[in-house]
Design a protein with these regions (language model features):
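Catalytic active-site module of serine/aspartate enzymes centered on a nucleophile-bearing elbow/loop
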Residues: 192-226
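Conserved serine/cysteine hydrolase catalytic core
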Residues: 137-188, 197
């Protein structure tokens, strides 16, 4: 995604979710793709929902969304955002933390969510956490912080009901950020949606359960065994 490839941006445009959705449209145009199957994980799911808002689904055949809420920020009437408790004030504080120490703020957000293993890994500062800290510290934080502000300003709940193509939803049963209530909300809001919750895996169910995910995708596309 724009601003996330480990290389600096070549132009000053802010990598908002709207800009990333247009990037997807530009990609489809460049390769002359129609009836595409598109997978969006985390920020990618938000980008795909923005794409649907801006461009519709006429060029898409099927959609796959992985472990994401249609609105990240919570309020008194919306408990299905980040950790069920991430209101505007907490988001503003998080953005301040990103400005101060981008890498550590991201690591803490992941660690102090719903997944106790992630918390233990952070508190023990295991090698994987150290490596992640080094990778995050090497990034230019400015475009990523601007991107986050764009993502947390978005609300795609109204988009879900407009989706006319089949959707596969894959959520982690031990997601760092979302409970099953979020998964069920998304499933119930999309007219033709199939939900799989992978038990005991975090925000990246497609990575922890690669073989199952591949089978589920092939079955969803009609290319599975039998």
């Amino acid at each position: 995604a724009r601003g996330h490839g480990g290389h600096p941006l070549k132009n000053p445009s802010v990598p908002t979710v709207e800009r990333m959705a247009r990037d997807l449209q530009n990609l489809l145009d460049h390769y002359r793709l129609d009836q595409a199957v598109v997978v969006g994980h985390s920020m990618g799911a938000l980008t795909l929902w923005q794409y649907l808002r801006d461009f519709g689904d006429s060029r898409l055949a099927k959609l796959i969304f992985i472990d994401q809420s249609p609105r990240l920020v919570t309020d008194v009437g919306w408990p299905n955002g980040i950790c069920g408790d991430f209101d505007a004030a907490r988001n503003a504080a998080f953005i301040d933390d990103l400005e101060t120490d981008f890498a550590e703020a991201v690591l803490r957000l992941v660690a102090f969510g719903h997944n106790p293993r992630a918390r233990a890994a952070y508190e023990d500062d295991i090698p994987a956490i150290q490596n992640a800290r080094q990778r995050l510290a090497a990034l230019d934080p400015r475009p990523l912080i601007d991107c986050w502000a764009s993502l947390t300003a978005a609300d795609y709940r109204d988009v879900l009901a407009t989706i006319t193509v089949p959707a596969l939803l894959v959520y982690g049963g031990a997601s760092n950020f979302y409970g099953t209530g979020t998964a069920h909300y998304v499933r119930d809001s999309i007219p033709n949606a199939l939900l799989h919750v992978y038990p005991d895996v975090d925000h990246a169910p497609h990575l922890w359960e690669r073989e199952r995910f591949a089978r589920d995708v092939l079955d969803f596309l009609g290319d599975g065994p039998g």
